């Protein structure tokens, strides 16, 4: 049981580190992070950011190794559509009339603590 709990903690920590890296990356590339880990009954958005007049809904996927495919492959069409719907809901709830774009930031961590980030814009 301890091993399972430890693995869950490691995954959570990896995910948090990935989201922090993604937020810094987005900021360096001209976006303003509005909110992180926004939740409602229909789901969660990892990062909400603004770039010019566009509200950007960002899904962050961090993976340690390629065993289960790349991080970007983990975000399928169903997930992309759900993220777009969540973006519209956030915008409505916050009185935001900006155009909405869904991006995915995939982070792959390889042995030797090598972190690789890939940003796909406008996936939905």
Curated annotation (Swiss-Prot):
| InterPro entries documented for this protein | Restrct_endonuc-II-like, tRNA_endonuc-like_dom_sf, UPF0102_YraN-like
Name the family. Belongs to the UPF0102 family.
Question: HAMAP family recorded for this chain?
Answer: UPF0102 (MF_00048)
Q: Which domain of life is it from?
A: Bacteria
NCBIfam families linked: PRK12497.1-3, PRK12497.3-3
Annotated GO molecular function terms are:
nucleic acid binding
* Highest classification ranks of the organism: Bacteria, Bacillati, Actinomycetota, Actinomycetes, Streptosporangiales
Q: Name it.
A: UPF0102 protein Tfu_0669
Q: Which SUPFAM superfamilies is this protein grouped with?
A: Restriction endonuclease-like (SSF52980)
């Amino acid at each position: 049981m301890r091993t399972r709990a430890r693995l869950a903690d490691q995954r959570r920590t990896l995910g948090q580190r990935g989201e922090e890296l993604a937020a810094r990356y987005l900021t360096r590339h001209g976006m303003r992070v509005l909110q992180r880990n926004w939740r409602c009954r229909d789901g969660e958005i990892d990062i909400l950011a603004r770039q010019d007049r566009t509200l950007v809904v960002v899904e962050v996927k961090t993976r340690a190794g390629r065993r289960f495919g790349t991080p970007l492959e983990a975000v399928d069409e169903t997930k992309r559509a759900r993220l777009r719907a969540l973006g519209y809901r956030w915008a409505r709830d916050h009185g935001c009339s900006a155009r909405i774009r869904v991006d995915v930031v995939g982070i792959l961590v390889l042995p030797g603590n090598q972190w690789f980030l890939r940003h796909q814009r406008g996936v939905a």
